[in-house]
């Protein structure tokens, strides 16, 4: 059971199976950047100056992708007005899905997957956190295009970056064989120590 809040034109559907359907995850308790962010005002909505927030940057990155569907945004009741206002300020539409209770990443993705599946046969989802800072949008778009090609072939795709050294705050992906130049098989995920 989930709550669904739709802030946009309901005539839109997920008819095109080849189209990517972005899911922006807006969970989190806002404790990492305290006192700037807090439970009622998490870091993805903190003003970075010049009409920028991490959430707006994510929305604008989504808008820069070709052949993209209307994004699903998963958030809780407390943050839905921040999401709605930010979408309006960016000139974007979005489907806002309200989590009945915060349960971390996997249930939030499942919520969006069920909502997307209700509107289309087998949609390809692009799962994005709302609080990442990415500098190179062109490189991001190229990576998404390669990932979409792999997903259309039936692969589940995750993004990774080459680390510049060991970090205890991050897990690692053990890379396997190449998949035609667009990616690699995953041998295993190594959880953070």
Task: Annotate each language-model stretch with its function.
Residues 2-24, 32-35, 39, 47-129, ...:
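Conserved N-terminal catalytic core of the sugar/cofactor nucleotidyltransferase
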Residues 43-44, 171:
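Extracytoplasmic/periplasmic beta-strand context in beta-sandwich domains
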Residues 137-193:
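Conserved core of the sugar-phosphate nucleotidyltransferase
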């Amino acid at each position: 059971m989930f709550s669904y809040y739709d802030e946009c034109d309901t005539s839109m559907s997920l008819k095109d199976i080849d189209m990517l359907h972005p899911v922006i995850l807006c969970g989190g308790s806002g404790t990492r950047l305290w006192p700037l962010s807090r439970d009622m005002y998490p870091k993805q909505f903190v003003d970075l100056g010049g009409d920028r927030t991490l959430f707006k940057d994510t929305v604008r990155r989504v808008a820069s992708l070709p052949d993209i569907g209307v994004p699903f945004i998963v958030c809780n009741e407390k943050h839905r007005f921040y999401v709605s206002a930010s979408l309006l300020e960016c000139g974007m539409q979005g489907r806002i899905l309200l989590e009945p209770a915060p349960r971390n990443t996997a249930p939030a993705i499942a919520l969006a997957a069920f909502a997307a599946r209700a509107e289309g046969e087998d949609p390809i989802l692009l799962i994005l956190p709302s609080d990442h800072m990415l500098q190179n949008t062109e490189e991001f778009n190229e990576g998404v295009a390669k990932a979409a090609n792999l997903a259309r072939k039936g692969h589940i795709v995750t993004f990774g970056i080459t680390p510049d050294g060991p970090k205890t705050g991050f897990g690692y992906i053990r890379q396997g064989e190449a998949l035609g130049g667009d990616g690699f098989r995953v041998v295993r995920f190594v959880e953070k120590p």
